[in-house]
């Protein structure tokens, strides 16, 4: 009986080959997708961390209201300046006129230098370095013309007196005597003219008697070169 059981057991036992582990060819793709997603997230973070360029805001165009306001302000400033000038005394008006004239001359000189391509600021009287008689004549005419521009000022007579005195300091006694004689001659001529003008009644078409000096020829001298009259040598 026991032998029957053993033979039955032996006949029932079936040895089957072990099934090979199934290999999934798609296995691991989910991991790759996770890695790819993680890499994309890193790139997105880097893009977010990059500073974004901010565009400069466009300048607003001035509107009509602002333009009108600026024009009104400029008009008020002009009116205030006109009122200020109207309240000036005669002496202050003259000083203001000379100041504006000086500014205009400086502006004209600058424009002339730019037009002719002159870069050196040395010009006018500073450009002179006289050595000959003709050069001193030209220098004297230019200096006299420059000084005469301020003859309307109330301080001009005192200025001339101080200037002559300071110049004569550098002369000898004999040269100062010559200057004195020339000034006395000019003084005598001036007295005669002033008396003649005081006695002559003012009439239509009759001009005032004037004394011709070297200053009368300066403008022509400046325009046409060295064709200056000999009055300058006779006087000085």
Swiss-Prot record:
Residues 1-84 are annotated as: Disordered. Residues 47-58, 68-77 have a biased composition (Basic and acidic residues). InterPro entries: eIF3-like_dom_sf, eIF3j. Its main location: cytoplasm. Residues 28-46 have a biased composition (Acidic residues). GO terms for molecular function: translation initiation factor activity. One of its GO terms (cellular component) is eukaryotic translation initiation factor 3 complex. Keywords: Coiled coil, Cytoplasm, Initiation factor, Protein biosynthesis. It comes from the Eukaryota. It is found in: Cytoplasm. One of its GO terms (biological process) is regulation of translational initiation. PANTHER family: EUKARYOTIC TRANSLATION INITIATION FACTOR 3 SUBUNIT J. HAMAP family: eIF3j. Belongs to the eIF-3 subunit J family. Component of the eukaryotic translation initiation factor 3 (eIF-3) complex, which is involved in protein synthesis of a specialized repertoire of mRNAs and, together with other initiation factors, stimulates binding of mRNA and methionyl-tRNAi to the 40S ribosome. The eIF-3 complex specifically targets and initiates translation of a subset of mRNAs involved in cell proliferation. Component of the eukaryotic translation initiation factor 3 (eIF-3) complex. The eIF-3 complex interacts with pix. This is Eukaryotic translation initiation factor 3 subunit J. It comes from Drosophila sechellia.
